[in-house]
C-alpha cells in the first residue's frame, strides 16, 4: 500500500522511467519543442492535497534519489466543483513552456480533462491551453478554495502537467545535466474559505521562505515616481521602425498637444544586433547617429521629465553575440552556450554583467528600464548545468542593480516562476498579452487575463495592463477606465496628433499625475471562476479608491452574438469587498451610495441589487461610497476614479472638510433632516474646502 505524502515529504524509493544523466539531455530548448510527458524518475509516493497543515504549506522532498535530474509525482486532488489552470497557450511550432512570455492565461474548467479537449471553449484570440502550467485554483466541494503553485529551489524548478485522463502530475527538474540534490521544494499550497485570502496566504508563506523566493509584498515596495504620471511609448505606434528624428518629432508633437505626458518609453528598434543577438550597448548607429544625447537634452522638469528604455533580460531576443564591442573585463563574465553568449556561470559574473548593463543605461541618462523577454532567459540556459540557479541569478542581479542605481524597472514577458517569484524590489510587471488597436476579441481577452492574473501578480507587484490608444474607436474610453482602475502605469501609444483628450484627461490632474486606486483591481467573487468571453454573463471587477470608496466596473466581454446584451448589478454587499484588498470597509456607515459615473447620477442602495443592462462590448463604472454622518464623498466627477481625487480630513453631522486634489466639479451627497441632495460644487483651485449642510 502506497504511503500518502502530507506536508513534509519523506520519500524513499521510485520507479525508474527511462532517464539518467548519461542519456542525451531532453531539455535543450528550441522553438516548437514541448515538455509534455518528459522522461522522469517516477516516485511511488502520491502528493496528497486533501490534507492541509497551515503552518507548513511548502511541500518538500527530503530524500532525493541519486543521479536523477527529473522526478515526477502523481498529485491527488480534493473533490472540487471547478477551477482555473494557469498556463500559456500551446501554439504548434511556437515557443512553449517555460517561455511563458506574457501568455500566462487563466483556463477555466469543471473537470481538468476539459483542458485537454480539442473543442475546449477557451479564449478566442488564443490557441488551446498548454498542458504544462505553473498554478492551480480549485473551488472545493466543501466550499473552500485551494491554490497550488509551482516553485523554484536553489537549482530546481517544478511544474504541473494536466493529463488526458484529467489527472495531475507534478514534475521537478534541474532542466539540465546536473542531478537533483538536497532538500527539494516541490510546491506551495494553501486552503481558505476566502478566494482572496487563499492567494494572499500562499504569498505570505512564499515570501517568508527565502529558499524559494526573493519577494516582498506589493505594499512594502517603493513605487517608482515616474509611473505615478502619464506616459507615452513608441511600440504600438512604430513597432521596430524608430529612429532619433521620429522620437524628437514626437516629443515636439506631445508638447504641442497640450496633454501632460511626463515620460517617454523608447521601445524595441534601437538595439545594435546580429541575428537578434546583442552586439553593443551603443544604440544602432544608423538609426541613432548621435547616440542618446539629443533625446536626453529634451527632458524638462515640468514637461517630459523621465525617459525610459526597452531592453531584453538576456541581451536581445536570442541572447548576446560573440561579435560584440564589450570591454575585456565584461567579455570574460560571459560564456558561450548553445549558440549564444550568456552571463555566468558564477553568481559574481552575472552580477558584474548586469552592473555594466544597468550602469551604462544610467550613464546615458535613462531614468527607468523596461526589461522584456525575461521568461526566455531560462530556455537559453536549459540543457546545461546550474540552469535554474543561473537564470534566477539574472533576475536577481537585475533587481539588485536597478535598485542600487535607483532606476525604475518595468518587467515584461516575465510570467514564469523564476520571474514572478524574484521581484525583490521592482513593483511593476506586465499582466497580459499585448493590447492591439481595433481588435475587439484581443481587447476582451486582454481585460480578462489582466484582471485574473492580478490575483497572483498583484500580491507582489502592480499590474501593467500595457499601453493603449486613446483614439481606438472600438474601446479607447473603455481601455482608459481599465488602466485607471488597474493601479499600474498608464501610457499612451497613439500618434500624438491622434490623442483623444476626452479619454485621457479623466485619468490625470493638470500635471499629468494619475488618480490611482489604493490596490489593483481584481474580479468580484462570482467572476473569478468563469470565462467571461464564453459565459453569457457580465464580468465585474473592483478596487478600493480614495479614503473609503469602492469602485466597480461591470463589463460585457462575451464574444458570441447570442450574448450581445447581458445584465449586471451592484449591491450593498459589494462594498465589503474593500476588506479583501487589505483596506478598511467600516460597517458603521448609514448606507451605501452608488454613483454611476457615466450618467453622473447617484442612488442609495437598498437590500436588492441595482440592475444594469450592458449592450455590446461595453462597461459601466460605479463608485460605492459610504454615507456617514449624513455625508457621502464622491469626488471630482470629471475623473474616472472620482473618490481618489479627494482626501477626507474631517466629518461631523453638519460639516465636511476635504482636501481636493484637482479642479473640476466636486460631487457630495448630503442627508440632513430627511432631505437628501447630490451637490455639485465648482472647484477652481485644488486645496482645502469646508462644506456645511
Regions found by a protein language model. Give the residues of each.
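Bacterial Sec-dependent N-terminal signal peptides
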Residues: 1-25
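N-terminal accessory beta-strand-rich subdomains and adjacent acidic, glycine-rich linkers
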Residues: 24-207
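Solvent-exposed beta-hairpin/edge-strand motifs
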Residues: 82-92, 574-599, 669-681
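Aromatic-lined carbohydrate-binding/catalytic grooves of carbohydrate-active enzymes
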Residues: 225-388
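Alpha-helix-loop-beta-strand connector modules within alpha/beta enzyme cores
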Residues: 292-299, 389-409
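Glycan-recognition surfaces
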Residues: 317-362, 396-503, 519-530
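Carbohydrate-binding surface patches
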Residues: 483-486, 491, 530-586, 590, ...
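C-terminal beta-strand-rich structural cap/linker in extracellular carbohydrate-active enzymes
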Residues: 605-646, 666, 675-693
Amino acid at each position: 500500500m502506497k504511503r500518502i505524502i502530507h506536508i513534509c515529504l519523506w520519500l524513499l524509493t521510485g520507479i525508474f522511467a527511462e532517464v539518467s544523466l548519461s542519456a542525451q539531455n531532453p531539455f535543450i530548448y528550441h522553438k516548437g519543442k514541448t515538455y509534455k510527458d518528459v522522461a522522469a524518475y517516477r516516485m511511488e509516493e502520491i502528493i496528497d492535497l486533501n490534507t492541509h497543515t497551515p503552518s507548513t504549506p511548502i511541500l518538500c522532498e527530503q530524500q532525493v534519489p541519486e543521479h536523477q535530474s527529473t522526478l515526477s509525482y502523481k498529485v491527488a486532488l480534493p473533490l472540487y466543483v471547478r477551477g482555473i489552470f494557469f498556463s500559456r497557450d500551446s501554439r504548434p511550432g511556437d515557443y512553449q513552456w517555460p517561455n511563458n512570455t506574457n501568455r500566462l492565461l487563466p483556463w477555466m474548467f469543471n473537470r481538468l480533462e476539459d483542458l485537454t479537449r480539442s473543442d475546449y471553449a477557451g479564449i478566442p484570440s488564443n490557441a488551446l491551453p498548454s498542458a504544462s502550467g505553473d498554478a492551480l485554483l480549485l473551488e472545493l466541494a466543501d466550499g473552500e478554495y485551494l491554490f497550488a503553485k509551482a516553485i523554484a529551489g536553489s537549482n530546481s524548478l517544478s511544474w504541473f502537467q494536466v493529463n488526458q485522463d484529467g489527472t495531475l502530475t507534478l514534475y521537478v527538474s534541474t532542466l539540465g545535466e546536473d542531478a537533483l540534490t538536497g532538500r527539494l521544494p516541490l510546491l506551495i499550497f494553501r486552503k481558505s474559505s476566502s478566494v482572496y485570502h487563499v492567494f494572499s496566504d500562499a504569498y505570505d508563506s512564499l515570501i517568508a521562505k527565502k529558499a524559494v523566493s526573493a519577494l516582498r509584498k506589493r505594499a512594502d515596495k517603493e513605487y517608482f515616481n515616474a509611473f505615478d504620471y502619464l506616459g507615452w511609448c513608441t511600440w504600438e505606434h512604430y513597432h521596430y521602425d524608430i529612429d532619433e528624428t521620429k522620437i524628437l518629432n514626437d516629443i515636439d508633437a506631445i508638447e504641442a498637444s497640450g496633454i501632460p505626458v511626463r515620460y517617454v518609453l523608447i521601445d524595441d528598434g534601437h538595439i545594435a544586433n546580429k541575428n537578434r543577438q546583442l552586439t553593443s550597448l551603443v544604440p544602432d548607429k544608423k538609426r541613432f547617429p548621435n547616440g542618446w544625447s539629443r533625446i536626453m537634452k529634451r527632458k524638462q522638469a515640468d514637461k517630459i521629465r523621465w525617459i525610459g528604455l526597452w531592453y531584453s533580460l538576456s541581451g536581445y531576443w536570442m541572447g548576446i553575440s560573440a561579435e560584440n564591442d564589450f570591454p575585456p573585463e565584461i567579455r570574460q563574465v560571459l560564456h558561450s552556450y548553445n549558440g549564444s553568449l550568456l552571463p555566468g556561470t558564477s553568481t559574481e559574473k552575472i552580477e558584474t554583467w548586469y552592473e555594466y548593463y544597468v550602469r551604462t543605461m544610467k550613464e546615458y541618462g535613462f531614468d527607468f528600464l523596461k526589461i522584456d523577454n525575461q521568461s526566455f532567459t531560462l530556455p537559453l540556459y536549459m540543457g546545461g548545468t546550474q540552469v535554474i540557479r543561473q537564470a534566477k541569478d539574472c533576475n536577481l542581479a537585475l533587481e539588485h542593480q536597478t535598485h542600487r542605481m535607483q532606476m525604475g524597472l518595468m518587467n515584461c514577458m516575465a510570467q514564469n516562476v523564476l520571474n514572478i517569484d524574484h521581484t525583490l524590489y521592482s513593483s511593476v510587471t506586465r499582466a497580459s498579452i499585448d493590447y492591439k488597436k481595433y481588435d475587439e476579441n484581443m481587447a476582451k481577452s486582454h481585460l480578462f487575463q489582466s484582471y485574473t492574473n492580478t490575483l497572483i501578480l498583484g500580491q507582489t507587484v502592480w499590474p501593467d495592463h500595457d499601453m493603449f490608444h486613446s483614439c481606438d474607436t472600438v474601446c479607447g474610453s473603455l481601455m482608459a477606465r481599465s488602466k485607471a482602475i488597474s493601479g499600474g502605469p498608464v501610457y499612451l501609444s497613439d500618434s500624438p496628433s491622434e490623442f483623444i483628450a476626452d479619454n485621457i484627461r479623466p485619468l490625470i490632474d493638470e500635471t499629468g499625475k494619475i488618480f490611482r486606486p489604493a490596490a489593483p483591481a481584481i474580479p468580484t467573487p462570482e467572476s473569478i471562476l468563469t470565462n467571461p468571453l464564453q459565459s453569457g454573463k457580465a464580468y465585474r471587477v473592483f478596487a478600493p479608491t480614495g479614503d473609503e470608496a469602492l469602485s466597480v466596473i461591470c463589463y460585457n466581454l462575451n464574444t458570441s452574438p447570442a450574448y450581445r446584451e447581458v445584465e449586471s448589478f451592484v449591491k450593498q454587499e459589494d462594498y465589503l469587498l474593500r476588506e479583501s484588498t487589505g483596506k478598511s470597509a467600516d460597517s458603521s456607515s448609514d448606507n451605501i451610495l452608488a454613483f454611476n459615473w457615466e450618467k453622473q447620477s447617484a442612488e442609495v442602495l437598498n437590500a436588492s441589487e441595482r440592475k444594469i443592462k450592458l449592450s455590446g462590448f461595453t462597461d459601466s463604472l460605479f463608485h460605492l461610497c459610504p454615507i456617514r454622518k449624513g455625508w457621502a464623498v464622491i469626488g471630482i466627477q470629471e475623473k474616472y476614479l472620482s473618490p481618489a481625487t479627494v482626501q477626507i480630513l474631517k466629518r461631523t453631522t453638519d460639516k465636511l472638510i476635504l482636501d481636493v486634489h484637482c479642479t473640476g466639479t466636486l460631487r457630495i451627497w448630503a442627508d440632513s433632516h430627511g432631505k437628501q441632495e447630490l451637490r455639485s460644487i465648482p472647484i477652481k483651485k485644488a486645496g482645502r474646502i469646508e462644506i456645511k449642510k
